[in-house]
Curated annotation (Swiss-Prot):
Keyword Nucleotide-binding attached: no
Positions where lipid (S-diacylglycerol cysteine) attaches: C22
Topological relation to the membrane, as annotated: Lipid-anchor
Name of the protein described by the UniProt record: Flagellar L-ring protein
Gene Ontology MF annotations: cytoskeletal motor activity
GO CC terms, sorted: bacterial-type flagellum basal body, distal rod, L ring; cell outer membrane
Organism: Salmonella gallinarum (strain 287/91 / NCTC 13346)
């Protein structure tokens, strides 16, 4: 009996691990990869004894007199003003009906069928009907407001800027993560170095958290396992 119990423990542990793996659904983040970028160092100039140098070092602190401070290089920062307000509604209905009726008769019936019909005339009638009613509707709304400063991590060939950023806020025993990525047209950047999120292409906005509050909102692995097996 003791030998059997020793062999049963690994089997039970394997079953628990299998159930856990089947019931756990991994969450795939919308914003993947690094959430920041560092400026690229410029090439080292080669002294050739001439006033004109073909390769000039990149001086990020230098600014021409008539040039604004809009981001244009990798590592520059930009403020995204989150102004997402999306609502959608949909309703549909369908009605269908169909009725049919057919009747016919015989004035004379063959002699060998008179016992079946009981007289010299046979009347037959058939009718049928079908009806269908269906209705459906759905409503959804989403509101997101705030600000987030992101970093330029790629300058596209047409001059657009691909930006990415993350903000972490620790509250009690949980941490809130706000992640953003998208493509910004430099012409839409205001003088305060900000752009609304509604003017960002391919925007990915993610607001998630971890901690015991987030875990309380998730279904347990055993309950999720039986929910997947239930036919209801």
């Amino acid at each position: 009996m003791q030998k059997y119990a020793l062999h049963a423990y690994p089997v039970m542990a394997l079953m628990v691990a299998t159930l856990t793996g089947c019931a756990w659904i991994p969450a795939k983040p919308l914003v993947q990869g690094a959430t920041t970028a560092q400026p690229i160092p410029g090439p080292v100039p080669v002294a050739n004894g001439s006033i004109f140098q073909s390769a000039q070092p990149i001086n990020y602190g230098y600014q021409p007199l008539f040039e604004d401070r809009r981001p244009r290089n990798i590592g520059d920062t930009l403020t995204i003003v989150l102004q997402e307000n999306v609502s959608a509604s949909k309703s549909s209905s369908a009605n269908a009906s169909r009725d049919g009726k057919t009747s016919f008769g015989f004035d004379t019936v063959p002699r060998y069928l008179q016992g079946l019909f009981g007289n010299s005339r046979a009347d037959m009638e058939a009718s049928g009907g079908n009806s269908f009613n269906g209705k459906g509707g759905a409503n959804a709304s989403n509101t997101f407001s705030g600000t987030l400063t992101v970093t330029v991590d790629q300058v596209l060939a047409n001059g657009n800027l691909h930006v990415v950023g993350e903000k972490q806020i620790a509250i009690n025993q949980g941490t809130e993560f706000i992640r953003f990525s998208g493509v910004v047209n430099p012409r839409t950047i205001s003088g305060s170095n900000s752009v609304p999120s509604t003017q960002v292409a391919d925007a990915r906005i993610e607001y998630v958290g971890n901690g015991y509050l987030n875990e309380a909102q998730n279904m347990g692995w055993l309950q999720r396992f039986f929910l997947n097996l239930s036919p209801m």
